[in-house]
């Protein structure tokens, strides 16, 4: 493998044995691609804005003399960029402008004569845009729209599993689900009649539906039944024989062949053997007794031609009297319906008998009554309603997906078709459900991923946009029909409010629009790849059963079987598997390698769950020889959702990678194959809660996916083009681009600005720091700067800690963790949290609030950290209760005497009219102010601090743009100098010229002169561009802010809190091994090895066997080996050994392992590169052990041996307190530990007095309300059991809801008098009132 300069800094030793045929696709593509499809112009009009507009326009007036047509649309440019939107708290969006054409027709002239056409561009609201990282900025906060897994449109056949009826009979049902429109259900009842429901309303006999579709009784019988023909003889009947129809019946008469021989005797059951004999004897007719026809049903009406009397009606049971009538009328042949109990049920025939309607009109009226109960039906209304239900394109749409699924299920050849239903469609569904009831077909599996599809952002946004457009359509149609249209323009007809409201509602408050989880890069990526079955049009937690939540065979390679939340949402919220993607229909696909005649090719095909069932698919870990031919005879594979063994020649596809079945979070767990699934689930979920530490530390034992994840998450800065690093500081990196990657006529400089100390959604700190140096070559895709939780471009969520598995004085009882003081001293788990506190000055009824340092009744010391505008300084260290922003609010006017009014008028306002409503630091928070933002309403005068901040921002913008201009200008000038040098100018002559005069020289060579002129032109463009950019920036900074109504000013203060690790904080490994820190132990008391090195963390060995997450033990051994190798390399560097020796040792390390694919050609590295690599390996050699394809036990032992450690991975430890050796050897090594965002500082709080609940007068609960501890029913029992009467009394009275008692108690304590007088608890009064509300008068007699 070829490594770039920056990749050579630190190479991860990979133990993977399988070749990667396919790289993991871009992780955020599900979000970005979906939204791109929505916003991109689509000439076909099948999706996005185009589809929405075409589905609603043209809008015709009721009279038909005017219409509004859609021409085209255009998305404008956003006013503010993403960062500005986040600071200002506005939505990152672009205006949508639509070109509309209003056409007026001449009323007098012939139809369709155009009188007037007006075209105009109309504003249709702002559409939120997606950022490059797949998020939306809504009102200044980053949000993610989670994709939804919902039931695909189409037709589904199912049964009730025998739960509906007490007999346990299985009732079948069919449901046609459109993309939008009414649902149509067909279902059997316990008596086997078929019913229809529309939109889950009252059921009607299904034949009503057929009658409404203009089928007569006769048509219905012909559609669903075969006929049996009988010829009427004198004493008997002759039946036309179809032998197969007799199967399973008991012969009630002797069945004879054509030659008269008896084939089946009366009373015998007719079997397949008899039928075969009948077929062979070529018997076409069979003589049967007259009573054989009794009980069968007529297939048509039989009419006496002379009288016109109906002798036997279609679908009526035939009796002997009927037969006699037919004979008398001279009818020689009669057809009956072929019905049997085995596989040709009388379902439709029975249903027709329940059906009270006889013609189409009656059927339509019946449907109208069911849909609109209580309204008198008319013929037109009934017809219009039925037509609109399933046959109108405006009201009903199966969609492309629905039509495809519908046609495939009903075995119709083509996938394309109409979006509305046809008569044939409905009949086909009824035929299919009868087939299923007769046992010819199976019901569908609702949880199969071929029946559930993904709805992503773009599609959901389009649907909301269409909802808004439909609301507009109604208003436009009314306006088109009113008044004089000659004066109006399209703009006057359209009101964009409903569209904006629909879109805003979706992005702001939809269940699937979620506040982005921004704890660390992994949690961001996982959130964007989440697939939820909840949400509008989806399931609800309460109704979702076990089957929906369970892992389904079709999840393989599509949804992760491991990563899902614990709790009520388990199985309803899933994560996309690493390689999965959605196809054009919205079904999940996963890639497979094609296998031809037992040989694996490199051709990769994506298959959806529907297609996958047809093929035989082998796993990725099968043995192959050097040519790619499968070695084993019988190969483990999957076919139709079952695991089985097949011959190599039968295999058609093979997995692309062992990691393909799991999600990104699960594939970050090393040795995942040795962990129990439940613990792996916790491990995957807890990595998302890891807080970025102060200094990120790459995992020694990783899986090789860390780099992909860090780059795709967007938190690191990646080189857009190759080149050489020209300039680096903490906030910007400048790269001089390679000549061969330049676009013609550009300066060839790329500038990357870094994000510094900003707040994430979870209050963690986002900060980028450069990881490259000036002069380093970079190629496209190299990481230039690390973000939060990344180290040299690799994801680094925690720290590598030296751990020992042993009990230690009970301090690691029940998963507690004992850590060394050194961990805290070295700031290994110190994190920075940034809080945003805002102070809003409003315009109140009594006057406006004011932000000022002049606050009543506050001492000088409290104002010491405020400037003259009343706003805290940047850099001030503040603690709970300190004032951050001074604010005063006008008090209600007290009634003044005339004298006071006079004094007030003479001496002006007194400070007594205002009360202090300043912004203070919340209790238990201590930190440093790192930034202040002031937003002032347009038209309100800015205070001194706001102007200072504005000046600072303008100066910063000028500096940034100036430096950018300088760098770009230098690029142009250096190219001009090189041109002049090549044209014969000497270095000395160039040195004499003023800097910019190189552009105005004259050269003899015409081509070079043209090039020089181009450069001069480019320089002018740069200058103009700089002025324009600066002016835009300055205008944005100085303009007033658009604040909410009634708000005059907002001050936002950002407070950075540094949190060191302490007892009570939650920590975890990556294998679901979580615990709480019980004690921070002095270094000298920690167990240490024979060389005197103490361990950092002591874990309880009892946490491993019962949890079955052995992966952690293997990780510890591998970590010990990795660190040991690092120590050896450190020793070599310190002893300044020969580079050849160093190179040899490193080579030995990278070549270790059986069949390991990775080949690192250390021999091709220069000496400098070897030393630089060795320097980066000093802390330990990073290792990749991919999931299901990782290092084996033997390889771990080889690594330990290479590091000079015992192969058992166990050491003799000594007790730090006594110096004695422990009796047994202890497993010691390195584990990657995470600090989770469950910090004790955020949970602990204390209260003496505070706020009380209004009704019960009991203290509130929870830290947010500054509440108390609940002393509940069971705690009362405990005190009663102890007989602690006085303690119990004070708990239930003065400490809780005895209002007078508690105030008195407070006074007594202040006075030093420690006595209490308990009174009546308020909750007792509440109880009395409750009883009275039931109409029982209850009074308390106090004697």
Swiss-Prot record:
Keywords assigned by UniProt, alphabetized: DNA-directed RNA polymerase, Nucleotidyltransferase, Transcription, Transferase
User: Reaction catalysed by this chain?
Assistant: RNA(n) + a ribonucleoside 5'-triphosphate = RNA(n+1) + diphosphate
Which EC class heads this enzyme's classification? transferase
Question: What molecular functions are annotated in GO for this chain?
Answer: DNA binding; DNA-directed RNA polymerase activity; ribonucleoside binding
Query: Any keyword Transcription?
Result: yes
Oligomeric and partner information: The RNAP catalytic core consists of 2 alpha, 1 beta, 1 beta' and 1 omega subunit. When a sigma factor is associated with the core the holoenzyme is formed, which can initiate transcription.
Q: Could you tell me which HAMAP family the record lists for this protein? A: RNApol_bact_RpoB (MF_01321)
**What protein name applies here?**
DNA-directed RNA polymerase subunit beta
Q: Per UniProt, what is the name of the gene that codes for the protein in this document?
A: rpoB
């Amino acid at each position: 493998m070829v490594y770039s300069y920056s990749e050579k800094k630190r190479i991860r030793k990979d133990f993977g044995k399988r070749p990667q045929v396919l790289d993991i696709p871009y992780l955020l593509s599900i979000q970005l691609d979906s939204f791109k499809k929505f916003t991109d112009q689509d000439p076909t009009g099948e999706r996005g804005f185009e589809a929405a507009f075409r589905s609603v326009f043209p809008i015709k007036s009721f009279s038909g003399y005017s219409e509004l047509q859609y021409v085209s649309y255009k998305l404008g440019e956003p006013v503010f960029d993403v960062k500005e939107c986040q600071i200002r708290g506005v939505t990152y969006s672009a205006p949508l402008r639509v070109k509309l054409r209003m056409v007026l027709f001449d009323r007098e002239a012939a139809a369709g004569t155009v009188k007037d056409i007006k075209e105009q561009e109309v504003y249709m609201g702002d559409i939120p845009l997606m950022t490059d990282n797949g998020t939306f900025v809504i009102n200044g906060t980053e949000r993610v729209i989670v994709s939804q897994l919902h039931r695909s449109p189409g037709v589904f056949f199912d049964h009730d599993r025998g739960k509906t009826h007490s007999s346990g009979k299985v009732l079948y049902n069919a449901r046609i689900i459109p993309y939008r429109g009414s649902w149509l259900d067909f279902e059997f009842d316990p008596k086997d009649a078929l019913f229809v429901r529309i939109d889950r309303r009252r059921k009607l006999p299904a034949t009503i539906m057929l009658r409404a579709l203009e089928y007569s009784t006769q048509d219905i019988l012909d559609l669903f039944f075969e006929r049996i023909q009988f010829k009427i003889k004198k004493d008997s009947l002759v039946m036309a024989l179809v032998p197969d129809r007799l199967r399973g019946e008991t012969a009630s008469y002797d069945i004879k062949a054509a030659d008269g021989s008896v084939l089946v005797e009366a009373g015998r059951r007719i079997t397949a053997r008899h039928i075969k004999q009948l077929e062979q004897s070529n018997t076409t007719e069979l003589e049967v007794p007259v009573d054989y026809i009794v009980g069968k049903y007529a297939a048509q009406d039989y009419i006496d031609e002379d009288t016109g009397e109906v002798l036997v009606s279609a679908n009526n049971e035939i009796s002997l009297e009927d037969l006699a009538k037919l004979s008398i009328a001279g009818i020689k042949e009669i057809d009956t319906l072929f019905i049997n109990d085995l596989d040709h049920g009388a379902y439709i025939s029975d249903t027709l008998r329940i059906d009270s309607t006889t013609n189409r009109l009656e059927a339509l009226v019946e449907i109208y009554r069911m849909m609109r109960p209580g309204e008198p039906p008319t013929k037109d209304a009934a017809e219009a309603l039925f037509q609109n239900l399933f046959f109108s394109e405006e009201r009903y749409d199966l969609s492309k997906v629905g039509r495809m699924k519908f046609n495939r299920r009903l075995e119709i050849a083509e996938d394309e078709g109409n979006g509305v239903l046809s008569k044939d469609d409905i009949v086909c569904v009824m035929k299919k459900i009868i087939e299923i009831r007769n046992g010819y077909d199976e019901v569908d599996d609702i949880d199969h991923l071929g029946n559930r599809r993904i709805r992503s952002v773009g599609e959901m946004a389009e649907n909301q946009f269409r909802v808004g457009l439909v609301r507009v359509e109604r208003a436009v149609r009314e306006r088109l029909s009113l008044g004089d249209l000659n004066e109006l323009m399209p703009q006057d007809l359209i009101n964009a409010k409903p569209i904006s409201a629909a879109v805003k509602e979706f992005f702001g408050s939809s269940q699937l629009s979620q506040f982005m989880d921004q704890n660390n890069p992994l949690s961001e990526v996982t959130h964007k790849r989440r697939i939820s079955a909840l949400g509008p049009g989806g399931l609800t937690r309460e109704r979702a059963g076990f089957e929906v939540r369970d892992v389904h065979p079709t999840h393989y390679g599509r949804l992760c079987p491991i990563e899902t939340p614990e709790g009520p949402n388990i199985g309803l919220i899933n994560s996309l598997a690493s390689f999965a993607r959605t196809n054009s229909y919205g079904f999940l696909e996963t890639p497979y390698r094609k296998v031809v005649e037992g040989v694996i090719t490199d051709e990769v095909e994506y298959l959806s769950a529907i297609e996958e069932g047809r093929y035989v698919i082998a796993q990725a870990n099968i043995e192959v020889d050097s040519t790619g031919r499968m070695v084993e005879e019988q190969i483990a594979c999957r076919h139709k959702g079952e695991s089985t063994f097949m011959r190599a020649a039968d295999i058609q596809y093979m997995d692309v990678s062992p990691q393909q079945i799991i999600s990104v979070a699960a594939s970050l767990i090393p040795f995942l194959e040795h962990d129990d699934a439940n613990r792996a689930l916790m491990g995957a979920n807890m990595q998302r809660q890891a807080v970025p530490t102060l200094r990120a530390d790459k995992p020694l034992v990783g899986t090789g996916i860390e780099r992909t994840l860090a780059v795709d998450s967007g938190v690191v800065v990646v080189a857009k083009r190759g080149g050489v690093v020209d300039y680096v500081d903490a906030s910007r990196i400048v790269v001089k681009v390679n000549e061969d990657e330049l676009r013609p006529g550009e300066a060839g400089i790329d500038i990357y600005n870094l994000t510094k100390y900003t707040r994430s959604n979870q209050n963690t700190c986002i900060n980028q720091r450069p990881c490259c140096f000036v002069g380093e070559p970079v190629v496209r895709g190299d990481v230039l700067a690390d973000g939060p939780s990344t180290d040299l471009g690799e994801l680094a969520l925690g720290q590598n800690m030296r751990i020992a598995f042993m009990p230690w004085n009970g301090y690691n009882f029940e998963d507690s963790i004992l850590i060394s003081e050194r961990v805290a001293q070295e700031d290994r788990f110190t994190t920075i949290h940034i809080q945003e506190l805002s102070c809003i000055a409003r315009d109140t009824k009594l006057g406006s609030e004011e932000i000022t340092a002049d606050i009543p009744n506050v001492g000088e010391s409290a104002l010491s950290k405020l400037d003259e505008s009343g706003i805290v300084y940047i850099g001030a260290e503040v603690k709970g209760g300190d004032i951050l922003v001074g604010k005063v609010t006008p008090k209600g006017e007290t009634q003044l005497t005339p004298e006071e009014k006079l004094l007030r008028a003479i001496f002006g306002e007194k400070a007594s009219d205002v009360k202090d409503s300043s912004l203070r630091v919340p209790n238990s928070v201590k930190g440093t102010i790192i930034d202040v933002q002031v937003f002032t309403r347009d038209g309100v005068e800015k205070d001194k601090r706001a102007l200072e901040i504005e000046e600072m921002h303008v100066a910063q913008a000028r500096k940034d743009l100036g430096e950018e201009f300088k760098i770009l200008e230098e690029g142009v000038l250096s190219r001009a100098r090189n041109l002049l040098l090549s044209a014969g100018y000497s270095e000395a002559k160039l040195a004499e010229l003023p800097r910019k005069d190189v552009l105005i020289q004259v050269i003899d060579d015409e081509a070079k002169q043209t090039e020089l002129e181009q450069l001069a032109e480019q320089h002018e463009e740069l200058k103009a561009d700089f002025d324009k950019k600066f002016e835009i920036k300055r205008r944005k900074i100085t303009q007033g802010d658009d604040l909410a109504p009634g708000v005059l000013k907002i001050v936002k203060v950002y407070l950075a809190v540094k949190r060191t690790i302490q007892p009570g904080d939650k920590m975890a490994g990556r294998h679901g091994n979580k615990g709480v820190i019980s004690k921070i132990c002095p270094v000298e008391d920690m167990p240490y090895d024979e060389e005197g090195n103490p361990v950092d963390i002591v874990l309880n060995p009892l946490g491993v066997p019962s949890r079955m997450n052995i992966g952690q033990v293997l990780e510890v051994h591998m970590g010990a080996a990795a660190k040991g190798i690092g120590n050896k390399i450190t020793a070599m560097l310190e002893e300044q050994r020969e580079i050849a020796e160093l190179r040899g040792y490193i080579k030995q390390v990278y070549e270790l392992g059986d069949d390991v694919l990775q080949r690192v050609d250390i021999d091709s590295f220069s000496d400098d590169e070897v030393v630089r690599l060795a320097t980066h390996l000093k802390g330990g050699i990073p290792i990749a052990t991919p999931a299901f394809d990782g290092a084996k036990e033997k390889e771990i032992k080889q690594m330990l041996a290479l590091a000079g450690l015992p192969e058992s991975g166990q050491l003799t430890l000594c007790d730090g307190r006594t110096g004695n050796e422990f009796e047994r050897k202890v497993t010691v090594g390195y584990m990657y530990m995470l600090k989770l965002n469950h910090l004790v500082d955020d949970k602990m709080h204390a209260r003496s007095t505070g706020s009380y609940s209004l009704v019960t007068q009991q203290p509130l609960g929870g830290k947010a309300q500054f509440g108390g501890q609940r002393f509940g029913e069971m705690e009362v029992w405990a005190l009663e059991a102890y007989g602690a009467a006085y303690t119990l009394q004070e708990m239930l009275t003065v400490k809780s809801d005895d209002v007078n008692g508690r105030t008195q108690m407070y006074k007594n304590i202040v006075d030093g008098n420690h006595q209490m007088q308990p009174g009546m608890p308020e909750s007792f009064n509440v109880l009395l009132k409750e009883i009275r509300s039931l109409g029982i008068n209850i009074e308390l007699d106090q004697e």
